[in-house]
Amino acid sequence: MAQIGRGEMTDDTHGGGLDWLLDELLCRLSRADRAIVLSADGLLIGRSSNMSRDEADQLSAVASGFQSLSRSTGRYFGGGAVRQTVVEMENSFLVVTSAGSTAYLALIAAADADMGMVAYEMNLLIRQVGTYLSSRPRGDVQMTGAGRGS
């Protein structure tokens, strides 16, 4: 697992004050490795400092795709709104959770991670900064308010 350090953030980070919160989340979850926040359409909003921009963009695209498939499945089969998508792989989990009205928190955790604690900590972070995590889709051309561009 990668070592997490606050001094590793690069200049192209767009998460502002969000990135350090993702780092803190990973510090609380010893078996979690990477975390991002993304918009519903896959735009990267913030990333943990142990991720390169390219790696975070890739995870953002994957997480957005899984959430889209999950939402479609929920609608088609009457399952309702998607609260969380979990992908179990041989060596890790991908967990994607709704974070605000149009944003998601995605996290990679080791296969032996305590998934109850992962879900708890992710939801705790979302409750603490929920309105900050909300994001407008890129395609919304009627966006109003100064300084809210992507």
Stretch-by-stretch model annotation:
Residues 2-34, 41-150:
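Acidic, low-complexity cytosolic segments
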